[in-house]
């Protein structure tokens, strides 16, 4: 209770509005000598003298309250818990407590009026009751204030179990203005268990029984009995516990009575220090059967003990709900209506109905505070507007009974409290905007995009493995349990014939999603939390989008430029690009998922209708998620070769392959995506003639030459007999010029390397090759025009500088020849497909 110094500090337990009576100082302390047993009556004077001697010999009765270890005496110093006052004189300290803190019970004593039994420990009183009053539960406790001593007198009543706080003095007698308590069916009356093993008693703690007369009978430690109203036994531990104290509200006569059985045979005090039990009670005071079973296994205690423990804790905290109210509170709690603020938990008791005045409910009669665990407070709340406050060590929250919910957050209110000027009132925080209640994960409605991802995965496998589940978690943002439940439900529906998920229905869904996106205001981040980008203006987003089209990984110079133009920090720009890349990859992956990973290699032989549907799907998705690219950029022969090589291997590259192609070719990613889309359309009509050649040469290197091509060209170069016709025939047949064949041509025509090259057709202008490449954007058969330039470049191993220029000349000549040969045959192959792009 108090700070540890070289003396024990008197137990200070708060009471409320207890009137101090001018009783003669005939009683001060009770001397502890042994275990109390009933003894014959002694005179009142001898008893008073004994108490006075006790107060001199043993200045302070040591108190153990709710897990607080025994205090040691340190040089006779005393320190007040509730204010900075400290002194080395016990009398001055007690006077200070009585005058400055009138609501504190100091060194209470217990007495049994039936047997004249006196003790200072509640354990001794419990042992006495179990021995001499077995099976008796109708006890009446009367609190008497006598100078510096508080007396709790126990008597047996035949009707109700009443705990009342009274005052004794001239003219008052035994007035019963207290907390009346009736019997409860929750806990069976019985004998309390005194666990001597867990709470060993020291010799100085052993108390003798003393005999008193009239109402001046002393009982034990009020802090203990009030903190253990249900017979709870205290342990010497360091965990925080709830320590209620008696406090009379102004409307004490209107407050209903709460049953607090003092004797029970099944209460297990060891559960008071069990962290699992405490956490479970803090979450919800009414455990379900499943929770009880789990707690039984976790705590290694019988289920009946756990039930009794929960019932006692509810009595302590004034929680008494009907089954309907429990169900309602549980639903609201798990539906997310409780917005938890970490240091405070407010427990509101049941609403008082006019017809149920006799319902046993505790209403602020026993306000509680947590000792040793300041981050968690359970506070009683009255049915009226009474404000409950506590010391600065703990945080108490008060409020008004809410008709709609039983455990909401209640805004603390500051109210004057004349009896406790030293207590810090809880300030009222500014009002917060009410958020709509969150729905549980199982009840959240999935978006069309999430369902499309789930259906695409469902088509591949109705029993997804862990890798697929994790991928769906990243793509859809759903929880693992939601994904598992969705798959389970749809497996059941498919087996019963309720739903039929096919590729056609998936394609329709994707088209509908794309159309809805295209129809509404452009928002490039549908799958991400809006708060990440809500602070960016449209102008900032446009600047970022333009930069993203150029490169998804901006350079340092580009980042500096964006920081200047958008006024955003580097972290914000990096985060935006990261989310934008993630969105782009997810959209591309969605196209792959919609057609199934096992179908990627079968697109060539697929029906035209299926390919058309997939192309429409991919086109709609990509055009809706990606802004319109810049005008077509002419590609070099090397870039075209790399694209064709990848296209021959897979017509649907993964996002990683797109990144690799962008790095190798230097092209913008959107251009690469568009090129693949157009060539898939051309492949559908069967007009991509270079496809077969690339498929037959899987081992070709990145430079476009392989052994097969070289062997095919050599015989053609050697066949002509007339040396003057060698070069034109060589070019006419293979339409290629290999560097290693150049020497053979030179020897046959008996000319140098330069004349041999002059025999080839003239080099076309650069604009011709640009036009032939740009024609692919207008649907004029670009891929067939590019067929003649399959060989992009050859790796030069000779030392002549002119060999490189020879190679470039041959490429341009081949491209010009290909334009003239294929312009007519392929002019009608793509108008419709190019128009879709």
Swiss-Prot record:
Q: Which CDD domains match?
A: homeodomain (cd00086)
InterPro entries in alphabetical order: HD, Homeodomain-like_sf, ZHX_Znf_C2H2, Znf_C2H2_sf, Znf_C2H2_type
Q: What is its main location?
A: nucleus
What ranges does the record give for the region Required for interaction with NFYA, renumbered to this chain? Answer: 263-497
- Does the UniProt entry include the keyword Nucleotide-binding? no
Q: Where is this region: Required for nuclear localization?
A: 317-446
For the modification Phosphothreonine, the affected residues are: 37, 207
Give the Basic and acidic residues compositional bias ranges: 192-204
Q: Which Gene Ontology terms describe the biological processes this protein takes part in? A: central nervous system neuron differentiation; mRNA catabolic process; negative regulation of DNA-templated transcription; negative regulation of neuron differentiation; negative regulation of transcription by RNA polymerase II; regulation of transcription by RNA polymerase II; retinal bipolar neuron differentiation; somatic stem cell population maintenance
Q: Where is the composition biased (Low complexity)?
A: 164-180
Its annotated compartments are:
Nucleus
Residue ranges with Pro residues bias: 427-439
Residue span of region Interaction with EFNB1: 27-77
- Per the record, which residues fall in region Required for repressor activity? 263-446
Q: Which Gene3D superfamilies match?
A: Classic Zinc Finger, Homeodomain-like
Where is region (Disordered) located?
164-204, 404-445, 755-837
Q: What does this protein do?
A: Acts as a transcriptional repressor. Represses the promoter activity of the CDC25C gene stimulated by NFYA. May play a role in retinal development where it regulates the composition of bipolar cell populations, by promoting differentiation of bipolar OFF-type cells. In the brain, may promote maintenance and suppress differentiation of neural progenitor cells in the developing cortex.
Which protein family is it in? Belongs to the ZHX family.
Q: How does it assemble?
A: Homodimer (via homeobox domain). Heterodimer with ZHX1 (via homeobox domain 1). Heterodimer with ZHX3 (via homeobox domain 1). Heterodimerization with ZHX1 is not necessary for repressor activity. Interacts (via homeobox domain) with NFYA (via N-terminus). Interacts with EFNB1 intracellular domain peptide; the interaction enhances ZHX2 transcriptional repression activity.
Protein's name according to its UniProt entry: Zinc fingers and homeoboxes protein 2
């Amino acid at each position: 209770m108090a700070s540890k110094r070289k003396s024990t500090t008197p137990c200070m337990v708060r009471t409320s509005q207890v009137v101090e009576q001018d009783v003669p100082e005939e009683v001060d302390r009770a001397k502890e000598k042994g275990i109390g047993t009933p003894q014959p009556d002694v005179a009142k004077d001898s008893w008073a003298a004994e108490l006075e001697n006790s107060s001199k010999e043993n200045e302070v009765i040591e108190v153990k309250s709710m897990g607080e270890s025994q205090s040691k005496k340190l040089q006779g110093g005393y320190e007040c818990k509730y204010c900075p006052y400290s002194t080395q004189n016990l009398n001055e300290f007690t006077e200070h407590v009585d005058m400055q803190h009138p609501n504190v019970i100091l060194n209470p004593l217990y007495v049994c009026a039936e047997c004249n039994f006196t003790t200072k420990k509640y354990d001794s009183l419990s042992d006495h009751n179990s021995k001499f009053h077995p099976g008796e539960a109708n006890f009446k406790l009367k609190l008497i204030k006598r100078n510096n001593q508080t007396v709790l007198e126990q008597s047996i009543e035949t009707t109700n179990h009443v705990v009342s706080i009274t005052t004794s003095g001239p003219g008052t007698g035994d007035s019963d203005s207290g907390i009346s308590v009736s019997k409860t069916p929750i806990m069976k009356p019985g004998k309390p268990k005194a666990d001597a093993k867990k709470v060993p008693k020291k010799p100085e703690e052993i108390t003798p029984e003393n005999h008193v007369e009239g109402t001046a009978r002393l009982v034990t430690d009020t802090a203990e009995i009030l903190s253990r109203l249900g017979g709870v036994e205290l342990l010497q531990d360091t965990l925080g516990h709830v320590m209620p104290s008696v406090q009379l509200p102004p409307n004490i006569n209107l407050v209903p009575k709460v049953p607090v059985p003092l004797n029970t045979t099944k209460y297990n005090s060891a559960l008071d220090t069990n962290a699992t039990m405490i956490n479970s009670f803090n979450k919800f005071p009414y455990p379900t059967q499943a929770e009880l079973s789990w707690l039984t296994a976790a705590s290694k205690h019988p289920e009946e003990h756990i039930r009794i423990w929960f019932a006692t804790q509810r009595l302590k905290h004034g929680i008494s709900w009907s089954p309907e109210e429990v169900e309602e509170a549980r639903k609201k709690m798990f539906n997310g209506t409780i917005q938890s603020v970490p240091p405070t938990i407010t427990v509101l008791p049941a609403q008082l109905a006019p017809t149920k005045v006799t319902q046993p409910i505790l209403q602020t009669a026993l306000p509680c505070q947590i000792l040793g665990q300041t981050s968690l407070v359970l506070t009683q709340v009255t049915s009226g507007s009474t404000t409950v406050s506590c010391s600065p060590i703990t945080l108490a929250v008060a409020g008004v009974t809410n008709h709609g919910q039983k455990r909401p957050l209640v805004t603390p209110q500051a109210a004057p409290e004349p009896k406790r000027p030293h207590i810090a009132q809880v300030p009222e925080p500014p009002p917060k905007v009410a958020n709509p209640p969150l729905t549980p994960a199982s009840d959240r409605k999935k978006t069309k995009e999430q369902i499309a991802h789930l259906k695409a995965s469902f088509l591949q496998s109705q029993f997804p493995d862990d890798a697929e589940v994790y991928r769906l978690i990243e793509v859809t943002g759903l929880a693992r349990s939601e994904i598992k439940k969705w798959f389970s439900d749809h497996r059941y529906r498919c087996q019963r014939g309720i739903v039929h998920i096919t590729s056609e229905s998936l394609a329709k869904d994707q088209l509908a999603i794309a159309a809805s996106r295209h129809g509404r205001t452009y928002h490039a981040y549908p799958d991400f939390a809006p708060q990440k980008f809500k602070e960016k203006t449209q102008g900032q987003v446009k600047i970022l989008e333009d930069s993203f089209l150029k490169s998804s990984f901006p350079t340092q110079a580009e980042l500096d430029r964006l920081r200047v133009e958008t006024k955003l920090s580097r972290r914000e720009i990096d985060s935006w690009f990261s989310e934008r890349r993630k969105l782009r990859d997810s959209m591309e992956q969605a196209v792959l998922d919609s057609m199934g990973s096992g179908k990627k290699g079968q697109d060539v032989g697929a029906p035209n209708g299926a390919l058309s549907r997939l192309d429409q799907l991919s086109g709609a998705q990509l055009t809706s998620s990606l802004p319109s690219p810049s005008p077509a950029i002419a590609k070099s022969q090397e870039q075209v070769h790399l694209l064709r090589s990848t296209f021959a291997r897979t017509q649907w590259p993964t996002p990683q392959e797109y990144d690799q192609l962008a790095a190798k070719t230097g092209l913008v990613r959107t251009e690469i995506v568009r090129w693949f889309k157009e060539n898939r359309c051309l492949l559908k009509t069967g007009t991509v003639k270079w496809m077969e050649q690339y498929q037959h040469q899987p081992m070709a290197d990145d430079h476009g030459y392989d052994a097969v091509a070289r062997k095919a060209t050599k015989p053609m170069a050697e066949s002509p007999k007339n040396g003057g016709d060698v070069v034109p025939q060589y070019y006419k047949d293979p339409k290629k010029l290999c560097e290693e064949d150049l020497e053979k041509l030179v020897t046959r025509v008996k000319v140098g390397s330069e004349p041999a090259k002059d025999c080839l057709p003239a080099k076309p202008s650069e604009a011709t090759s640009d036009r032939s490449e740009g024609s692919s954007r207008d649907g004029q058969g670009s891929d067939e025009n590019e067929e003649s330039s399959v060989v992009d470049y050859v790796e030069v191993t000779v030392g002549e500088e002119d060999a490189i220029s020879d190679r470039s000349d041959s490429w341009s000549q081949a491209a010009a020849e290909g334009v003239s040969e294929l312009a007519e045959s392929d002019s009608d192959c793509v108008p419709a497909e190019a128009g879709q792009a």
